[in-house]
UniProtKB/Swiss-Prot annotation:
Keywords: Ribonucleoprotein, Ribosomal protein, RNA-binding, rRNA-binding. The keyword rRNA-binding applies. This is Large ribosomal subunit protein uL14. The lineage of its organism: Bacteria, Pseudomonadati, Thermodesulfobacteriota, Desulfuromonadia, Geobacterales. GO terms for biological process: translation. One of its GO terms (cellular component) is cytosolic large ribosomal subunit.
């Protein structure tokens, strides 16, 4: 569960290392974002000579949350960290690689490129 002012890790090679959530997209009074939701974030840490710079305002999709997510079969899944992937306005990832596992819920949200790049889908 991600809300405004949450610090997230970045799970791709776009160059950003930490993101700071500015806004959760989808509704005027929406407070929380879960797996597969899009947020607007500021880059708090970035590596030199990368596609995104420190201070850039980017869109990102949540791929892992520490808060458990219930599934239709009654099971739950949770991860060790809160992570996101930086995306462009066409909902495609800015980076070319995804690090770590991602949740199966991304497939239902039509983020096929992220699912195909991920080393493991849980």
């Amino acid at each position: 569960m991600i809300q405004m002012q949450t610090i997230l890790d970045v799970a791709d090679n776009s160059g950003a290392r930490k993101l700071f959530c500015i806004k959760v997209l989808g509704g005027s009074k929406r407070k929380y974002a879960g797996i597969g939701d899009i947020i607007v974030a500021s880059v708090r840490e970035a590596i030199p000579n990368s596609k995104v710079k420190k201070g850039d305002v980017v869109k990102a999709v949540i791929v892992r949350t520490a808060k458990e997510v219930g599934r239709l079969d009654g099971s739950y899944i949770r991860f060790d960290d809160n992570s996101a992937v930086v995306i462009n306005n066409q909902r495609e990832p800015v980076g070319t690689r995804i690090f770590g596992p991602v949740a199966r819920e991304l497939r239902a949200r039509k983020f096929m490129k992220i699912v195909s790049l991920a080393p493991e889908v849980l």
